Swiss-Prot record:
SUPFAM superfamilies: Acyl-CoA N-acyltransferases (Nat)
Species the sequence originates in: Pseudomonas entomophila (strain L48)
Main location: cytoplasm
Name of protein: Aspartate/glutamate leucyltransferase
EC category name: transferase
Length: 235
């Protein structure tokens, strides 16, 4: 483990929770003056931290522990029947790893995805500045994985390639292609990619039991949840 004791962290004031409307949230951030070192990031991911833009953070709420870090142990994952169908349905897609840059093609897909799938969320309305600040960061471990069908952009999975796994930062996809289940396929592809690169896990962020938008995460089994500072397997 990196010597984390030397790092500084800052907690926000309580603010409205993005996931549970009746709750107040507090967020713990790594000191933004700390360089974004991939090994520090990997160690913090083991402790439940995530990246958003240039910041590493985790929930630090006094009266709530509903946000549970989740990861998929890649080597032990076995797709179920529905997931095998999703893999087969999207076998015609090609995937390319590219550096994170702003393109109107990306933003147009992101905009339509947010407008049609997350118009009730805190990322609505989408803007170019928001998209760039959130996803287009010049970090050596960050990659855009493009999913294309005969040249047409269908999805982009934004991932961080860490020594201990792939961290799934965000995925946006063609909202009119509901039958393909592109969001689920992107996770399945990332599990396969983690195996190909001999990585331990795919980090999915936070699972919240009472948030319907998070329910999909526990459909990947086995999954590991960080409970009382220990990763616990849910089969």
């Amino acid at each position: 483990m990196t010597e984390l004791a030397r790092l500084k962290f800052y907690a926000t004031q309580p603010h409205s929770c993005s996931y549970l409307p009746d709750e107040q949230a507090t967020t713990l951030f790594l000191d933004p003056s700390q360089p974004m070192d991939v090994h520090v990031y990997a160690d913090l991911s083991e402790m439940g931290f995530r990246r958003s833009g240039d910041h590493l953070y985790r929930p630090h709420c006094q009266n709530c522990n509903a946000c549970v870090p989740a990861r998929i142990p890649a080597v032990r994952f076995i797709p179920n029947r529905q997931q095998r169908r999703i893999l087969k349905r999207n076998a015609d897609l090609t995937v390319s790893a590219v550096r994170p840059v702003f393109k109107e093609e990306y933003f147009d897909l992101y905009r339509r995805y947010i407008e049609q799938r997350h118009a009730d969320g805190d990322m609505y309305p989408p803007s170019r500045d928001q998209f760039s600040t959130f996803l287009v960061r010049d970090l050596p471990f960050c990659w855009f994985y493009e999913f294309r069908l005969e040249g047409r952009l269908m999805a982009v999975a934004v991932c961080d390639l860490l020594p201990n796994g792939l961290s799934a930062v965000y995925t946006f996809y063609e909202p009119d292609e509901e039958r393909r289940s592109l969001g689920r396929y992107a996770i399945l592809w990332q599990i396969t990619e983690a195996l190909r690169q001999n990585l331990d896990a795919v980090y999915l962020g936070y699972w919240i039991k009472n948030c319907k938008k998070m329910n999909y995460k526990t459909q990947y089994r086995p999954i590991e949840l960080l409970i009382n500072q220990r990763w616990v397997t849910l089969n």
